[in-house]
């Protein structure tokens, strides 16, 4: 069982289709989401990133997560398993993340052989056996939309 603890969206209005190179919108969304949830970044056990495996998105995410001090939190992306389902990706990946919480295991980021970003991130390379208490789902979209959602295990 799990409970939605907090969720928020921010828009950096950066570009019609490309994410902000600075990660500002995602940084603001996650910061506000953590504050709303009443927890600190180091309370997070797991991050399900938007993770498109594109240069601009992955770099932007690594910058935002670095600024937030989330470099060591286990992180994965489900897109290699289910594809980029566009508007449904946040919902689909939230469900998969909640299933991870329930089963006590976090899936590896399929096909991630090289971490090609400038900031340190802790990409899950093999199935990770943990019982997450808090999980962060992030998503970024066209027009500068950035969302963050924190789920708590009950």
Language-model-derived ranges and their functions:
Residues 6-13, 51-53, 82, 140-141:
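Glycine-rich beta-alpha junction loops
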Residues 1-3, 28-42, 63-81, 89-142, ...:
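Structural signature of cysteine-dependent C-C bond-forming condensing enzymes
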């Amino acid at each position: 069982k799990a409970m939605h603890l907090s969720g928020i969206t921010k828009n950096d209005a950066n570009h019609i289709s490309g994410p902000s190179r600075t990660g500002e919108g995602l940084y603001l969304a996650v910061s506000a989401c953590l504050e709303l949830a009443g927890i600190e970044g180091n309370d997070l056990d797991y991050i399900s990133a938007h993770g498109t495996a594109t240069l601009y998105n992955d770099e932007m995410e690594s910058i935002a997560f670095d600024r937030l001090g989330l470099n060591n939190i286990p992180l994965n992306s489900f897109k290699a398993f289910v594809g980029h389902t566009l508007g449904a990706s946040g919902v689909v990946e939230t469900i998969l993340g909640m299933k991870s919480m329930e089963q006590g295991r976090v899936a590896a980021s399929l096909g991630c052989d090289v971490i090609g970003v400038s900031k340190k991130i802790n990409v899950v390379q093999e199935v990770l056996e943990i019982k997450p208490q808090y999980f962060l789902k992030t998503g970024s979209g066209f027009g500068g939309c950035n969302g963050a959602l924190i789920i708590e295990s009950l």
